[in-house]
Amino acid sequence: MRFTHRITNSRLGFFLLSAFTGLLVGSSTVALIECVDFLQGLLFGEPATDDPNQLDSRFSGWSVLLVPIFGGIVISVLLRFIPGQRFHGIPDVMEASALRAGKMDVRSGVSAAIATTLSLGTGAPLGREGPAVHIGASLTSWLAEKFNLGRTQSLTLLGCAAAAAVTASFNTPIAGVIFALEVVVGYYALRVFAPVVIAAMGAVIIRHSIYGNRPEFTLPDYQIGSLWELPVFALLGFVAAFVVQGFIYLVIFCRAGWDKASAPVWIRPAFAGVLIGAMALYYPLALGVGYEGTSLALNENLPLVLLAGLLLAKVLGGAVAIGSGTPGGVFSPALFIGAMLGGVYWYVATALIPAELSSQGVYSVVGMAAIASAMLGAPISTLLIVFELTIDYDLVIAVMLAAAMASTFMQLMPHSSFFRWQLAERGINLNSGRDQGLLRTKTIDEFVTQNFIRVNSAVTLTAVETSMYSHRRYIAVVLNDNEEFIGSLSTDELVAGVVTDREATCKSAMNASEHAIPDSTSLLAALQSLNELDTNYAPVTKTGDDAEEVVGVIYRSDVLKALYDMMRAARSEEYGVN
């Protein structure tokens, strides 16, 4: 204990822990990649060629139908034994960072690792990067617990895990760091920046030792034909935002369809496997992570019909998979969809615009950035991911413009990003800041006071006044003859009633029971209720089988103090030392 305390309470010690985190998460991410590749090779066969510009012949024949069906059945069996019957991903890491001081269940990471290997290895058209981030985050949460880390250090270590996972998965250390700060940690601060960079460097060491220092995609030397094309690139960002919105609504539609069919949650991946397998008979390149298809599109090796077909197949297949609860991420699908969309957009634009445009590959790169930016809600890290994946900075203006337009239009639409939508489905809204998010999840029960007395509705105001004075209480809870809660009375309301008629019963001056707030109410909802009621207090009730039971009183001042404390804690995390 003394050793761990010494390590984590010195800057050098925490830097060493950050480096270890990078090595650990980098190793877990590479292990996930290798396991998925091994399973794909076992079930589909090894690739016939290493040339990214040639079609991968292993995705052919009846295996593309049967293997996804087999995978869906296995995932269904596994899902039946998972607590909550739900696999976890990046939204859970965001939630842990914003609302749970970085605490995560390491068992969810283990189940995610097994399930992701099985789903992607059997062809689910999803990504590995999101699960890799979640697996790494759950491991570092376990580390933080073992080292007795405080809230701020635990959150920083969570950011280290995210940076290391993205770095090891994509070979993009700069983008990994920015993604961790932009999406997971939620703010930029020098105190957090240094450990996250160190973790990313640790992941780079692991990645380079296994795969070498090579970009994920190798491209020709693309150039923008003319700056007058910028409005065309901006429009591509607008189209990308609509495609992502459509993808989200397809996921919603699929979930609603499963619910309407009353299909058990655990059996849905099996049926999804059948649909994905049938789709793969026509578009096998849409299976799995899809880097082969993405590379072909970026290198201008796919015709219009195949680009459009793969675009629809990945969108529909990804929506079906996610809607059924199949584990996997949206990083790689976003890149795939973007590359295909950019290619299709180029064909349409060249048919409509008489002037000569840049090559199709340029539009595939720009489309990849636009879709990923809209999907992830992380435009800065998306730009860097695209640049580091392609090692092509000549397209920077077009990529930045399309990504900015896509992100801007997403903010004007119902769902600002895929991750934010997933959190909103659980009643978590982080758009207004982490302090507002904490207020939404923190209930009022710990702020309830016992500063009240109970009186019968037939008691006179004079008697209530005497009882309040003798017990030094400011609120009277009014009960009927059956001891059921029917209203409340504050000292201000008591004084107003006494001035009118001292011998009137308290029932005549009380607030009705509708002014009460259930004990499960969040702090934010409680504050909104107090504002709507225009009151400084409210009785807190616990609803039983027969009647509401008053368990205490909550004051506006206590809610406002809680809000202030949370805002100060959030700012301290961003700018403070500890």
Predicted regions mapped to residue ranges:
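Alpha-helical transmembrane segments and immediately membrane-proximal extracytoplasmic
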Residues: 1-441, 445, 450-451, 455-467, ...
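Short hydrophobic beta-strand motif reused across regulatory alpha/beta modules
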Residues: 178, 384, 486-492, 551-559
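Structural signal for short hydrophobic segments within the conserved structured cores
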Residues: 451-455, 508, 513-516
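Residue-level signal for well-ordered, solvent-exposed loop/turn and beta-edge residues enriched
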Residues: 484, 546-549
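Nucleotide-binding motor/catalytic cores of P-loop/tubulin-like NTPases across gene-expression machines
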Residues: 488-491, 503-506, 523
